[in-house]
Amino acid sequence: MGKKIRAILLALALLITTAIPVGTTLRKSVDVKADDAGIDIVFNFTGADLSAKNENGVGYQLYTWSVGGGDGAAYDMVVNGDTATYKLHLDYISTLRQGFIVRFGDNWDAKDFESDRFVELSDVLGGTITVDIKSKEAKFDVDDSQAIKGLKVTSAAADVNDLTKITFTVGQELTDTASANIRVRSMYTGEFIGVTSATPDDTNKAFTLVLDTALERDGAYEIVYDSSDEFKDQTFMIALPDYYVSDEFENANTYTGDDLGATWSAASTTFKVWAPLATDVNVNLYQSGNEGANDLIQSVPMTKSDNGTWVATVDGDLNGTYYTYSANVKGNQVETIDPYARTAGINGKRGMVIDLASTNPEGWENDKNPFTSPNQEDAVITELHVRDFSIEQSSGVSEANRGKYLAFTEAGTKNATGQTTGLDYLKKLGVTHVHLLPVYDYATVDESIPNNTQYNWGYDPQNYNLPEGSYSTDASNGAVRVNEFKQMVKSLHDNNISVIMDVVYGHVYNAGQFSVNVLTPQYFSRVNSNGSGCGNDTATERNMVRKFIVDSMVYWAKEYHIDGFRIDQVGLYDIDTVNALVKALKEVDPNMVLYGEGWSMDTNMSKDIRLATQTNAWRTPGFGYFNDTTRDALKGHLFTETEVGYANGANAAKVADVISTITGEPAWADDPEQSINYNSCHDNKTLWDSLRTRQPANGYTEEELMKANSLAAAIVMTSQGVPFFQTGEEIYRTKTNADGEFVEDSVNSPDSVNSIKWDTLNDAAYASSSDYYAGLIALRKAHPAFRMTTYDDIYANLNVVVDGKQDDDAVIAYQLNAKANGDTADGIFVIFNPSKNTKNVTLPEGNWNVYVQGDKAGTEVLGTAKGSIDVAPISATVLVCEDGTVKPVEPNNGGNGDNSNVTPGASDNNKNNDAAKPADNAAPNQAVRTGDNTLVTIALIVVMLVACASAVVVLRKKKFN
């Protein structure tokens, strides 16, 4: 049994995960007068408190998009009594499906129902459709009795091997193709291409067109047809074989050089850009970085070079000169920033030539990663946002540097009562790594406004290779943001803190305006793909996209001394790209820490690839994934607001998942370093707010909630794998709006919601909690036994002695072996008591020193114990034997008497055994969310029994532990 069986069961479950719900259509036969005014869809929403508003004063919104039509839009719904309504008008009757989400407020993640849903329009030409939606319900009703029905092309694709053939389908039977007047037209020239025949299949819904001229692979074409006498000249774009992944394109246009962008020297600057479809390219030199400023110095023609690149060298010292590229692409004149720009002017519209060496702070040449371990398990990571860290006056940071990179360079900061804040606080906390939310150039904060109070997390990338300007003291000077970013990194390094950068290559802010797509249309983005939930997905499988991502991250690692990366929505990436990143980054620094969000998402891939999801973790060695099992086990399932977890309700149903956390072994992981264990991150509610929201039936006092917070932290900090927490979790960080309501996702909420409130340290309970976290971190760092690097070691050295089944209080206790992973201890014993009762737990034979008890934790002995110990309600206790009196742990194989039937680890011999691994790219139709998510492993297994009998077996288990 063990890990192999769990993996096989998980694969079976994921392979049959159910699809996204669709609506029930109420069909009536009515005569509707045709007109050509488009399609109206009336959305009616009921069953929610329609008077409610979020912190931005926004109530329920409808977010809707035409499938295949690019980005969608959000609309405020009009409330009338108990119904909120929005009437959507579609000018383009060629729309086949209209997607919609009802959400509370203006945040992506505040969906009323988890899944994206769709209204089918495959035979609708006009009139009105009514969609009735009930809050929190999957089913919705569609009334199309007032719709005009008719012929509609629903798909069209050129033959991959013969570009004179096109296959197209229609939504209703077509027996007379002549009446439809079917033609093929070039979208570039407007010229029609002759059709020699149109042959139907047996259904009269699928047809093969034969053309008298072959289509061009890099062209754009559409079918033109008449739906009826009233609806003539309708169009549908023909899908061509993906020219960008063809051997012809990739062999001719895959550039492998390392000199893209502007390469500066005092004597000259060489500009090189990849634009394989362009017929001419110029580099435009400007005096300023302000878009629209009439200050062109000169426009220099570029010469076509190898593998789709264009190059120009301009003599003279151009340091500080701003520039763009203009190009003729398929007859269109375009201008854009350099995709490889190293820095830019205000709002990232013009790149800037820069002497990077001139931006280095003093001592930069000797700066290096203070994290010297190649084992990711040795990291302790805290996540924070640059602005949140210091924007409050209580941060003690100088006014000029509040919310800026330079806040991290100020030592000795304190709040008004003398409590340590800022950089010194991080140092005191003892974390090894600070994970910074996006600090590349993002789109949604206007840098032209000094000290702009506009706020965003930054998951809306605009330029990937330069720092965000709003965090610098002068966004108008491209050199300042580079220098100040480096000062921040060096200061953190000088204080023994490594820097992890949060990167978002899986989607861009605006696909049509993103520089790569401007120069090579649609190259960076997958076709008609929105798995990210942000309007576009990045085509990581294309050669030059993969190169761009690897080049970019290696550049940050080398130029800015970044020590690790967290990849947003890495489940959209192909595993080859992730493995290329791991290889390239580990070559820069073997101690690099790498992890991401491995949620399974629905995305349209242009090649036969595997995605870097949790279930494919074994295919991406050296790369970790957020362990949502831990999160949901400790505080309750993210998407079930009424559910309590192990730490905040002694939920016995969560015990198995807590033990899988302790052993660093979620069902999908292949190595302990792949399990990023956490209670909270920037997404969703803070841990403290979640605990206050989720309480057992008998309720918790504030003191008990504080204990639950500490217990959840203790489990993460003493478990195998990699501990991670949101900065402020240790001081009960809350995010509430002006009305006192919890903010679920504060992506664009004001500073009043997002900032770290350093004055809370004035409260003794808050300061004590901070000390508790610091003590846990110090204890973890002092004991390698908490940081074992293989499942073989864990299997040999960790024994679950009390597995939560001994009584109704779900107590768990485990023992770590003497000298495990090079530890100096003769044994470690850890006990978790989530109940409201004091529990007496029998200790293994030996003399034990207590290091964690009640609200105290650290590396100082708090007391001694022998035989047994009382464990306080809702608390953790950690004891260490240091005199050789404890017996060594026997391997935990599920046969340890009555104490345990849980296997904590699996042999590393399975690491290369395909049969032991989960299915690839599982759950493709799982509901998608930006930021945080949950791996769906709950499924129905339907077993059909032949011989006149059938049975349905339902297997429902969160993780197969």
Feature names for model-found ranges:
Residues 39, 100, 104, 292-294, ...:
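Active-site-proximal helices and loops of the catalytic beta/alpha 8
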